[in-house]
Amino acid sequence: MTRYVLVTGAYGGMGSAAVKALAKRGFIVFALDRKVGEAVENIIPIEADVTDPDSLQRAFDSVRGLTDRLFAIIHYAGIYTLDSLVEIPDAGFERMFRVNVFGAFHVNKIFFTMLGDGSRIIMTTSELAPLDPLPFTGLYAVTKSALDKYAYSLRMELQLLGINVSVIRAGAVRTNISVSRPTRSTLSVGKQSSTNATPSTSEG
């Protein structure tokens, strides 16, 4: 039986690795990201922005045209910046929440009707960020903590429908999300911030 999986942040480091591994194992993977590659065997690129419900609705329509059931939704979409919690612009603060927290919320809400008994939702968070945040990574830690609590609460609700929700606490992985170019000094201790750098929207 053909099994279909939706992966967000599918063209980032961890997302891309997951997509390739799933495709190799015979899953048909809907690879969702803002910028996508060419379709290859078992991988169907879906261009969409997790912060834009209209974009996700179009993605849903594309997926729904090929199948009415998803075996799993796997979340890798996310952004990361280094910044001071007292200096980060409001727009930067809000954007990280829109991608890291609301992104998962929007995807799950829109694609929920394609899940059924035995389906799964897998959230990817940082192993250390929610538990032991470091200086200038506080906002990232806050969003990942929120995603943790969202996932655990969602698990209790969806288990009533036979849908499993899991959280993967990934350790440190060298990917584009962790490569940021400092652009200005922050605070008086000589630390650096990457607020003005272009963040990746793919976790990994």
What are these regions (language model features)?
Residues 11:
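Conserved glycine-rich cofactor-binding loop
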Residues 25-39:
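Conserved glycine-rich Rossmann-like NAD(P)H-binding loop of the short-chain dehydrogenase/reductase
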Residues 41-54:
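Rossmann-fold cofactor-recognition segment
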Residues 76-81:
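Conserved NAD(P)H cofactor-binding loop of Rossmann-fold oxidoreductase domains
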Residues 84-85, 92-94:
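Substrate-binding pocket helix/loop in short-chain dehydrogenase/reductase
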Residues 122-146, 152, 156-159, 172, ...:
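Catalytic loop of short-chain dehydrogenase/reductase
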Residues 160-204:
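SDR active-site lid
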